[in-house]
Amino acid sequence: NQDALFDELLMLLETKKYIKAKYIKQVKSLYKWLNKDLEKCREKMIAFGDIYEDEDFDEEYAKLELIRSYLHCYQDDWKIDYDSLNHFLSEALEQTFEITFEEAQHEFARIKNKVETESDYTLLYVDTGCDNFYCLVCPKSAETRIIEIADILNLPINH
């Protein structure tokens, strides 16, 4: 059941820690519509202010927007603002985290490795299909299951 898997994904990503209950309910509803009626999902996302009426909209874009708009997702462009990333990760990890351009050199694997070395968390890469840098934070113990669920649900979440 895709809805049950999506619920499990939200739980494993510790979504309740970051997102208000009403928005969790909203993303669950949108995900159900995404699987039933893509046009109805589009209408609801426009009504909620998640997308604009003139945006090209397909299933892949809808899934990316659900992640971007409703999950605790770091969003940046390819240049990465390291002050912003450090702030985001410090809040998510509930401890001070700092990485510099010199350490990371815009390489996701280096950032992920440092997060794993300094905490019980890891990072998951969100494939935007362009040169943006999006990532999710999750407990190391949940990474494998999150990737399995993302594969089943065809969500753009990778190691």
Identify the role of each PLM range:
Residues E65-L124:
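Surface-exposed, low-hydrophobicity interaction/linker segments
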Residues R110-H159:
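Acidic, proline/glycine-rich low-complexity IDRs
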